[in-house]
Amino acid sequence: MKLLFFFLVLAVSAAVAENAGVQKAFMDIEIDGESAGRIVLELRGDVVPKTVKNFIGLFDKYKGSTFHRVIADFMIQGGDFENHNGTGGHSIYGPRFEDENFTLKHDRGVISMANAGPNTNGSQFFITTVKTEWLDGRHVVFGKITNDSWPTVQAIEALGSSGGRPSKIAKITDIGLL
């Protein structure tokens, strides 16, 4: 009986350790003032804890910010809570912080840090709508969306243009941990 209990504790501990650092977050979205749904994210703090800490630490600033760059069949980009055009934002660590690692890859539906080159992560992020392997090793992936989030992501993607300027305003109205 004691041996069975030991193995049960060991199995539960292993399962908890495997999920340690993975957190779920949400973004409620509106398009031109009308609710467009919710994006649920699985944040991989087990792989990139500093990057996830930065993202979570900016929740209050992300509230009310927009997806300022939207390109169909590529990605939707947000996180510029200062200028709402891709020129602003900063990290919780200062203006910029270094690339943590490139372990996670740019599959369809991942959330990744936007940057201006190596070690220039701030607050801006993007969600891919297709596989974008050419970004591997250049941008830090820190999570992915859940399958039920696709309708909301696709509603934002539908606003896109080849130049990236969205046809309507897609805004984060609320954001937090689940």
Curated annotation (Swiss-Prot):
Residues 1-17 form the signal peptide. One of its GO terms (cellular component) is cytoplasm. It comes from the Eukaryota. Its EC number is 5.2.1.8. The lineage of its organism: Eukaryota, Sar, Alveolata, Apicomplexa, Conoidasida. GO terms for biological process: protein folding. One of its GO terms (molecular function) is cyclosporin A binding. It comes from Neospora caninum. Disulfide bonds: none annotated. PPIases accelerate the folding of proteins. It catalyzes the cis-trans isomerization of proline imidic peptide bonds in oligopeptides. Up-regulates interferon gamma production by bovine T-cells. Stimulates high levels of IFN-gamma production by peripheral blood mononuclear cells and T-cells. The IFN-gamma-inducing effect is blocked by cyclosporin A (CsA). It is an enzyme of class 5 (isomerase). It catalyses: [protein]-peptidylproline (omega=180) = [protein]-peptidylproline (omega=0). Residues 26-177 form the PPIase cyclophilin-type domain. Keywords: Isomerase, Rotamase, Signal. Belongs to the cyclophilin-type PPIase family. PPIase A subfamily. This is Peptidyl-prolyl cis-trans isomerase. Pfam families: Pro_isomerase (PF00160).
